[in-house]
Each structure stands twice: as structure tokens, then as C-alpha cells.
């Protein structure tokens, strides 16, 4: 199958079954890649010069506990000032906001625990805290130098942690920290998103080990915060009132529910007690307005009477409410019955929005934050100048210096694969900048469509029969050109309304038209009908469906019709194109299965919904066709619980499709952060092995386990302006980096496989956690790049390998399968039917696709 020069793959190394509790060690980097033309780049990594000293680590215990980090930082700052003469002297300790304190010189307390009392001046009365300090360990920076130069097998985690705390200490006092980033409200100009939210800009900062050097990774970042404003204005934004004056009546139930959803969990501060701006967290919104909402009020006589909130404010605060018809906020603990009228509350500044943004907010956010690569590069350089780490007294205390120029890196631009089409001329496409087209080409294997139907859920007056007829003709023409002939008119073409009519209509179609291959469904914008079409088609009846937006029917373009054909052909079992067999790497010499895996979690703040795990596996030698498996699992659980059973299903399916047993398994795992590498590898590698052994006692294919990461802050820029590509001035598709900014000893690389269209391209980061197949760097990089060209939905190279992308689509589709018509809004992926507490079994059943759908690429 493989002809052409290139190394022959080493046979898989024997895989020993490890002792329980044994930590798998990621393989060392085998070599550095050499193929491709070289390209000079700059990365947003800044070299750190670190002295070979010891740092002293102390543990703090602050009582009362559970203070926010911001308060803890104030306590420590007061403590260092107050006990300067007795303990701290001129030392500048750094603190992580929880319990870790580091100093450059030891404190004069020996190994004993020291108890101190610290007073914080408060708005009302002073607050007193008890702080204990205890020596933990000496952190050796010499050990770090040894690890970076390869003399030590692994980078000591505690040294990275200590350096991180040093570098973050000052920014944490100045800005609002969120994860590894720092934010501030934009001075002078606000960037509203609507719904009481706005964009805050800031920067990401993290300390990263790399070859020979520690690096500081700096990037610009942006996130959504709640606007500091009166709650009355917040209500108007959330419920789309021009002003509160137009709302003279109490809120309706649906308005109250919408408002509650937005404000629950937020902090508000009161405005009716002068300087005493007490803060509270909102736990609910009352059903009754302030004029009717009562609470038990204890009188001076000791008697308790029911009093309305409006009356209480009038008697106690001499405040006649302007909006007594609006509800109150219930704050603090639910059982305490503390109610505040909306008009005496403001939203506290600096609260990050963790709830999912609406589609409109997301697109506003992208418009506000997308920067061309050269602009982003300039912004990062500006950031470095203003951060001036070399004058930061805490950084200097530890003898650290940071270079203020970006790191120069040499990358390589890999050759794209040739793409083979079918038809008479068997045309070959050569991607240019990650893109090719289908003009004068036909699908490798096109499906002939004889029996098909149209169901139009758009109103007839907007999407007329003339529109449908014209759309049908255009679609048939384009499909014929693409080698997927749609024969004759649809056997059925009717209008329908609402999600409830989907199932009866589809049942009628299935029972009436033998051999029905496809239902084309026309939708009027965003609608609950989509989720229902997919639920019924994929899971209930096993019918292939293709949804089309009404606007694309009213105005057809060859491009949208061609894209539809790409999806339809694959759903019906066709093959759009394949990698040119002669150009594939040696791994294809023996039967190999490519697996892609991903876990998607429900949006933050949604505690009831399950996480969804999806694994897909290739089913042919190209590899082009894939099969999917999907499971629901515990909320926010990152490890794929049922992986062994899922992989077993896919291996059986592969054997049925090809009559071969794979000798190699290449597993691309998406959605794992660095902190979880060890855990995920240990559990999931064992699960894959278990799947093999359960099929056959001695079946031990070589496994390569690669984590794919897109959520990182590495950005690469062309040094030479002439190398920049497109309007956004990005790096070319195929740019690969495996030196200087990568791991000092482990096998990882960056690959930007797609052409950046908007904003700055984000290269994907690949980290090999296990490799029985002993890939060379070149071979794994080329294989990965080629797999990015096999994604069926478009004629472009995508940013991650097709199997990983498909796993993401499968999990995303399962969210729609979980939409529960009775209880969920149809906000697409914000929904998964758990709102009414359906049990795990019901959820598991809901995501299982129909027998007839199982072997198809229904998710395409």
C-alpha cells in the first residue's frame, strides 16, 4: 500500500501490563523533525533567566477560613507590614492567595509553627484574623536547571509552581485574576455585549519549561464580565426594556424566570445605607412584588409580625419605593428570608460571567476581540513593556530576569497531501494554503439518490413553492456535477409546523416510501425543530436527515449547495475523497485504526446536566469513513468512564468493515488539560488495552496516545512580512514547531494545519503520552497533518485531525438528542434534558443512536 521513499516503521514495542498504581511515563522525544521548508517565526514566549538558588516554601493557615483570595492577599500584606521588625525584615514574600508563601531568604522562625494575629480595617468594624506560618521545604532552582538540560528525568512540579507564584504576585494585587489571566475594566471605553455583560481585556501569563530555558508565555486575552450598574438597569438589559418606566405592571412569570436565571449567584451591593455598601450574593428572585412580599419582623416588644418589604423600607429607612410592583432579590442563605428591593442594589464590579454567552453575544465578542496576527504581536509586545517584569520588586527579590523580546523559533512548513477524487478523470487536488476546490471533480464514491423527501418547517409565505422548486433544481444540478446524482423529483414535499409534527411526519414517510434514503428539512432560523429532527432521525427511526436554513433555499449559491452535497454523500455511505495512497506515511503498510475521543461538558453554572463522551473510529484504509460511539457520564467527569466498551465496539466494527484486525491503534484525545495528563493516560490507556485483550487473549496492537490541545496561549508569528498569509497576516497552513518552545524532554509539537481566516491562528498542540509504535517526529507530524485534510464537511484542511473533530461533533449532536421537548428551551447546546432530573438510564438511552444509523456518519 505504501510506495515511495521513507522509513519503514519499527514493529510495535511489547506492551507490558503494568502493576496497579504504576504511573505511565510519557515517551522521550525520539528526534527532531526535519521535513518541510524552514520558516523563521517568533513565539509569544519570553526567556527567563533564573538563578541557581533555593527558595523557601511556607504554609499559611488563615482563620476564619473560606475568605476570597483577594482578602487573603490583603491579610498577608498587612501581616508582612505589621511584623516587619520581628519576622519579615526587608524580605518581600510572595503568596498564592490560598496557603503557599515563598521567600528568597529563610524567615527567622526555624521549623516551628508561628501563630500571628492580623487586623484588617473594615467598612464597619475591624476584622481580626489568626494566621499560622509553618516551614514546608526548600525548593531548589538548581534542580530545575538540571531538568531543563535533560540531566534530570522530569521537571520538578514544585519549582514551576514557586516561580509561577513569584511572577503572579504583583499582577494579582493590581488586577482581577481569572484562571491564569488578569483583567481590568477598559478605561474610558466600554465594550457592551448586551444582557448586562461587557468585554474586559487583559493578559494571560504562565511559566513554562522548555528546552534549556524557562519561558514566560504572555498573550492578550478577553472575557465577559457583568457590567457594574444599578440592578434596575440590569433588569432592563436582560428583559429588553428601553427603560424601566415602560414596565408599570409586575413581571410576568416568564420574565421573572429569565431575570432569575441571569442574576442568581451574582453579588450585589446596597445603596440605601450611606457609606456602608454591604455586599450580598443573590440566591433567588421573589414571586411577589415588594409591595406584597412579606417577612417575619421582630418588634421591640419581642412579638413577630408579617411586614411587607415596601412598608419596612418606608418605616425603617424613610424610603418610599419607586418601583413597588417589581420583585425583590432574595440574598444570603435561602432560609434566612433577607429581601432587597431591586432599586437599592447595584451589581458589584469585577464579576466574571461564567454562564454561556448567547449567539449574538458570542459574535459581538469575536468582533471586539479578533486581531490580525501583526496587531496581536504588537499588543503582546506593548503588554510586555507595560508589565516591565524587570522592575517588579517581587521578581527582582528572587533574582529573576525576563527578556522583553519574543523568542525566535525556526519552524517548518510541511507539504500538504494530494487529495484523490473519483469519476472518470480521477482528478487529484493539491491544497494551496490549506484550501482546494471541487470544480471539475467528482466524489471518489458518489451515492445515487433515488428516493428522497422534503419537509419544509419554514412558513409557506416566506419559503414559497417557487423557492422549493428552484432549490430542488439547483441542488440536483450541483449534485450531478459532484457525482452524487439525485434522480427525479422528491417523492414527498410538504409544509409542516412545530417540533411536535416531526415524529408523526417522519413515521409516515418511513412507512409509506420504501427505500427512502434522505429527508431534506428546511428550517426558519434557530428553532426547537432542529433538535427534534435529529432526535427522531438519528435515535428513534434511523433516517438520514439534512437540515437547510430557509435563507439558503430562498437564495441558493453553488457554494452552499456544494457544501450540502459534501455532507449528504457521506451520510448516505459515500466517500468524498481520499488521501493519495502513494503519499501516505509508512504506518499505512499494516491495518491501522484511527480513534478520536472527546468529552464535552455542560455550560458552567449548570450542575445537573451530564457530560458526554464520544469516541469515533476509522472504518477503512483511506481513512475516510468513521463510526461513532457515545455515552453520558457524570457531570464534569473528564476521564471517559466506558472507554473499554466503546473501543471494543469500534474494533469489532472495523473488523466487520475491513476483515482485518488493526495492528496499530492511533488515539487522538481532545479536551485534556496538562494537569490531567497522568490521570487520563493511566485510566484510558488501560481501557484501550482491556478492550483488545477482551476480544482476544493475545491481541496486543501497538497503541499511540496523543493529546490534542487547542485551548492554550501559544501564538506564532512570521518574522518575514512576505511569509504572512491572507488578510490577517497569519502563519502558513502546515507550520510545525518542535524546538525551543516545546517540552524539554517529552514528545510534543505545535502544528498549525489550517489557514487562519479571522484573527490570529491558534496552532494545535500535540503531546504524545504513549507510543508503542515508535514514531519518528517527522512521521507523526506528517500523519497528523494529512489527517487534518480528511474532514468531510469542507474542502479545506482543519485545525485538528478529522477523528478528533468528529468526536467533538458526535458529542455535540448527543446534546441535541438529550433535549427534552417538555422541559427545555431550544437553545441548542445549552440544553440537555436533565432539567427535570431524568435519571442516568433514561439519559443513556436518549443518546443511543438507532441500529440503522449506527454504521453511518450521521454526525457529518
Curated annotation (Swiss-Prot):
Q: Which residues carry this modification: 3'-nitrotyrosine?
A: 2
Xref: InterPro entries: AGO2, ArgoL1, ArgoL2, Argonaute_Mid_dom, Argonaute_N, PAZ_dom, PAZ_dom_sf, Piwi
Q: PAZ domain: from which residue to which, for each copy?
A: 230-349
UniProt modified residues of type Phosphoserine = 388, 825, 829, 832, 835
UniProt GO MF annotations? core promoter sequence-specific DNA binding; double-stranded RNA binding; endoribonuclease activity, cleaving miRNA-paired mRNA; endoribonuclease activity, cleaving siRNA-paired mRNA; metal ion binding; miRNA binding; mRNA 3'-UTR AU-rich region binding; mRNA binding
Phenotype of the disrupted gene, per the record: Embryonic death with a strong defect in neural tube closure and apparent cardiac failure.
**Residues of the Piwi domain:** 518-819
Residue numbers carrying 4-hydroxyproline: 701
Q: Specify which residues bind a divalent metal cation according to the UniProt entry for this protein.
A: 598, 670, 808
Q: Could you tell me where this protein is found in the cell? A: Cytoplasm, P-body; Nucleus
Modifications after synthesis and translation: Hydroxylated. 4-hydroxylation appears to enhance protein stability but is not required for miRNA-binding or endonuclease activity.
Domain comment? The Piwi domain may perform RNA cleavage by a mechanism similar to that of RNase H. However, while RNase H utilizes a triad of Asp-Asp-Glu (DDE) for metal ion coordination, this protein appears to utilize a triad of Asp-Asp-His (DDH).
Q: How does it assemble?
A: Interacts with DICER1 through its Piwi domain and with TARBP2 during assembly of the RNA-induced silencing complex (RISC). Together, DICER1, AGO2 and TARBP2 constitute the trimeric RISC loading complex (RLC), or micro-RNA (miRNA) loading complex (miRLC). Within the RLC/miRLC, DICER1 and TARBP2 are required to process precursor miRNAs (pre-miRNAs) to mature miRNAs and then load them onto AGO2. AGO2 bound to the mature miRNA constitutes the minimal RISC and may subsequently dissociate from DICER1 and TARBP2. Note however that the term RISC has also been used to describe the trimeric RLC/miRLC.
- Protein name in the entry: Protein argonaute-2
